[in-house]
Amino acid sequence: MSCHKLSAPNADFAFALYKSLNAKAAAGKNIFFSPLGISTALSMLSTGARGETHSQLFSTLGYSGHDQAQINEAYQHLFQMLGYSHEDEQLDVGNAVAVRSGFTPLEKFLKDVKDFYAGDIFKVNVTRLEEAAAEINTFIANKTQD
């Protein structure tokens, strides 16, 4: 499935999310978020979800007319397209799943995150929140040339 099939549901999700965030924001405050980042994270999560959780994720993201394989292929196409840079342009995208130490996700989930979402997987100790946050922030800084 072409990444272009993600445009309408991702735009609808982005505007709904903005509307929700804006309703809760303090007056005069700016809202800064990455709709693509959030929809990608939830889509990666959906690869490992089943049952009601999967249905809720797909409904929220507007993917109800598609199956998981189609969504995975569309994101794979999107990240392949984003990976092509021109000499005077650069766009860095980084996806990752931070897994709680001691928890082992299913191998298929790990493979799908890597294959379809160009995602990295690393373990974090969630009992040490500051260290976990630092690891995640370091990953982001490295991916964004910060």
Regions found by a protein language model. Name each.
Residues 30-35, 52-65, 108-118:
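Short alpha-helical "patches" and their helix-cap loops
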Residues 34-39, 45-47, 60, 64-66, ...:
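Surface-exposed loop/turn and secondary-structure junction residues enriched for glycine/proline
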Residues 45-81:
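Active-site-surrounding "flap" and adjacent substrate/cofactor-binding loops of secreted or lumenal enzymes
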Residues 1-56, 142-146:
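Flexible propeptides and autoinhibitory/regulatory segments associated with cysteine proteases
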Residues 28, 68-146:
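Non-catalytic, conformational "gating/processing" segments within enzyme and secreted inhibitor domains
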